[in-house]
């Protein structure tokens, strides 16, 4: 938030000093239908952390905390947000405002226990019945850190590299309280397949590299992982594949096309098979519909204009100016909202993704391909992308799973499938079984 520091200072000046309130404890409330819990402590200094259980997010550390009488001010840099609240006379409620671009009224009430962490029955727990090794490998001047797992029995194993979706993620592809790659690696290794999963650039033990990295740059990281597997004597170098989720699926396609002698098979989990711009336009429509707020014709036209503007851009400064002009004309957006959106949409990664066309690579993919999608995936639409996969890769095995979302989780309804963190299952058991069966069928 550009003026967050000033806003924080002004809120402090507006505070009313009264009595010494008791803010220490656990406080629950709801912001935009999402339950949240603040944990407030004071051991000589104030400390606040935040949980969003439904999103699977816990222990989000807050920044500066100021308490003056009955008023508390909490800065949340990780969320680009501020909370200001006034405690009731009985110390049982806090009446406040959650400010994140817009101001949302919220009432916090005391709770005697911390937010319940959702059960994750598939998350692997030691002791493991296979070998696990922390490893590093290099891609030029970038060091990537990961975990290599292999079965105890056998001397040379089929192997896969796991490649995560968009956004910097750790080796477990940890999101919404789930660890999909940890679950996949555990399942595959228990069934005789070696697995290498690694931290994305700038996460965990991996070095950051350039801020301008695009999908094509990240594809070279995945190939460095393949090269690492090829260097190991315990790997069957004629059976090394890439399993990519979302953007990672596109990376698998790119590397299968450009390194046909090194990539023996690929599996795309909700991988894009159409242009990035078409993915994003469809995603916007589906997300709005599933949230019960379908786009009007004018809103749909605005979305398309923004994406087409990015696709046609050749200069980042001019693109930012063009996006600013479009957004200023399409609604009541705050300056903060506009600038945050432009920062994302004019970034090298986003621009490159919009322009990236899998059709450039798909005709060159000759290795075996398993393309998988869930029917309730609103981020990478199954009909749109599996249809393209069938058309461009007639030799591919294509599977659509009814009632599964972008993470291949089952849910009770299409709308509920959007709440990844609220679903206990990390990934469908049937999907895991099909992956193992398909890999083992590759001779």
Predicted segments with their positions:
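Catalytic active-site module of serine/aspartate enzymes centered on a nucleophile-bearing elbow/loop
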Residues: 404-408, 412-443
């Amino acid at each position: 938030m550009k003026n967050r520091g000033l806003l924080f200072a002004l809120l402090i000046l507006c505070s009313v000093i009264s009595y010494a309130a008791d803010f220490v404890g656990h406080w629950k409330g709801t912001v935009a239908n999402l339950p949240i819990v603040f944990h407030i402590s004071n051991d000589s200094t104030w400390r606040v952390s935040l949980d969003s259980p439904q999103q699977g997010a816990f222990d989000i550390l807050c920044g500066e905390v100021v308490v003056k009488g009955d008023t508390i001010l909490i800065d949340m840099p990780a969320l680009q947000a501020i909370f200001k609240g006034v405690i009731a006379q009985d110390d049982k409620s806090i009446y406040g405002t959650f400010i994140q671009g817009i101001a949302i009224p919220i009432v916090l009430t005391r709770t005697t226990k911390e937010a319940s962490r959702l059960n994750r029955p598939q998350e692997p727990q030691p002791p493991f019945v296979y070998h696990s090794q922390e490893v590093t490998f290099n891609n030029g001047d970038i060091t990537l850190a990961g975990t290599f797992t292999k079965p105890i029995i056998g001397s040379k194993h089929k192997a896969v590299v796991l490649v995560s979706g968009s956004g910097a993620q750790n080796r477990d592809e940890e999101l919404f309280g789930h660890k999909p790659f940890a679950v996949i690696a555990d399942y595959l290794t228990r069934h005789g397949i070696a697995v290498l999963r690694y931290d994305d650039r700038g996460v965990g033990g991996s070095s950051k590299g350039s801020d301008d990295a695009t999908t094509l740059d990240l594809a070279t990281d995945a190939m460095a992982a393949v090269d690492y597997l090829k260097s190991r004597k315990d790997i069957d170098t004629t059976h090394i594949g890439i399993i990519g989720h979302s953007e990672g699926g596109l990376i698998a396609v790119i590397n299968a096309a450009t390194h046909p002698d090194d990539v023996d098979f690929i599996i795309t989990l909700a991988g894009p098979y159409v242009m990035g711009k078409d993915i994003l336009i469809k995603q916007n429509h589906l997300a709005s519909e599933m949230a019960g707020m379908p786009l009007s014709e004018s809103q749909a036209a605005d979305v398309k204009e923004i994406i087409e503007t990015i696709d046609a851009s050749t200069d980042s400064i001019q693109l930012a100016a063009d996006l600013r002009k479009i957004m200023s004309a399409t609604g009541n957006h705050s300056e903060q909202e506009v600038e945050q959106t432009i920062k994302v949409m004019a970034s090298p990664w986003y621009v490159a993704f919009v322009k990236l066309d899998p059709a450039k690579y798909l005709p060159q993919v000759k290795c075996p391909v398993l393309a998988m999608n869930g029917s309730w995936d609103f981020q990478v639409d199954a009909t749109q992308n599996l249809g393209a996969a069938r058309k461009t890769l007639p030799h591919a095995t294509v599977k659509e799973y009814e009632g599964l979302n972008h993470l291949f989780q089952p849910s009770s309804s299409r709308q509920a499938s959007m709440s990844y963190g609220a679903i206990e299952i990390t990934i469908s058991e049937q999907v895991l079984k099909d992956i193992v069966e398909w890999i083992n069928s590759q001779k």
